[in-house]
Amino acid sequence: VDLRQEPPPLIIGERLNTQGSRRAKELVLANDFDGLVGLARAQVEDGAHCLDVCVATTERSDELEFMTRLVKRLSLEIDAPLVIDSTDPKVVEAAVKQIPGRPIVNSINLEGDGSRFQALAPLMAKYGLPAIAMCIGPKGMAKTAQEKLDTAQLLYDTGKKYGLQAWQFIFDVLTFTLATGEAEFADSAKNTLEGIRMLKQKFPESFTTLGLSNVSFGLPASARKVVNSVFLYHALKAGLDTVIINARDVIPYPEIDEQQKKLAEDLIFNKHTNALAELITHFEGAKAVATGSTKRIEVDPSWPADKRSYFRIVNRLKEGIEDDVVQAIADRVKGVKLVRQEGRLVLKAPTKETAHEAAVETLNEVLLPAMKEVGDKFGAGELILPFVLKSAECMKAAVAELEKYLIRQE
């Protein structure tokens, strides 16, 4: 997998991490390797390019042995690169030796005496490994944009002493929760966005990343998806290359309710002193559902079939698309009959030729333009890859139904 996705981001799945996922911790404590592999597979199906793997717990002391067994299973059964997440360099090296390809190391920093970086840098040089480089220096976590840039420069310069190349640095610019209301962190999201811009300008051959959900930690569950999704949109605009998230928890930016979008952006950009209170009041007062989408997206049965088909592809509403496509074809044919067979609409056209022509028109006038809109939104950063893949699944189902009415050319 190329670290530089076009368009970005490279998605690093965060659920296989005992420090942040209750489910992952339960599976580790239960020695449930099958369950962990299943959790990994589900993230890949949801659109993750890579998987963060952390198995450390306070309840058990066999992190090295457990990590070694797990990454061996994952390497054999999951088609996705791994991100080895451990504070113990010995665990990282043991895991690296079990993986046929090149994993990402998570993470290096220069906290304290820099001993962690000193232990891992030779390993990175030996195996040619990239690493998430946290913007943490001798003075602690970098908070202002300039501090982030200065710390990244220190990380980079230190790495060069070990022979590390620019592409081996994935700078975590750090993001802090906006839920505390503390003045110290009121501009933290703005500083993160500006830090991304500054690092991308200074280190064009390196990469940037964020543990995105940190920005909303402590907010009501119903608000977190909105804040995370809005922040991701602006981070990508700033130049973010990779992101550590649960792809399932992201809402496409155009689908976020305008009022909720404004509340989130007021908080992220610290537009006024009541931004946090207003956001919390809105989400707690409205008792918004914690499951996500802020706009109810439905197909109106009264719409013409062309519009229904187009809408389903753009908005990833696969169920029912076959009938809508058949109806769209039928609307282009005179003297057509529609019957329902085994629960599906079937077209009975006067001739195969008329059905063929109508199917081609439907493809060119409805289905292909719908996928073009999806592609345009992807290119503009309004959609991330998992949503494009779901639209592609709708397109595939639509074309499979449409092909029944095409005349095969010998």
Residue ranges with predicted function:
Residues 1-410:
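Domain-level signal for soluble alpha/beta catalytic cores
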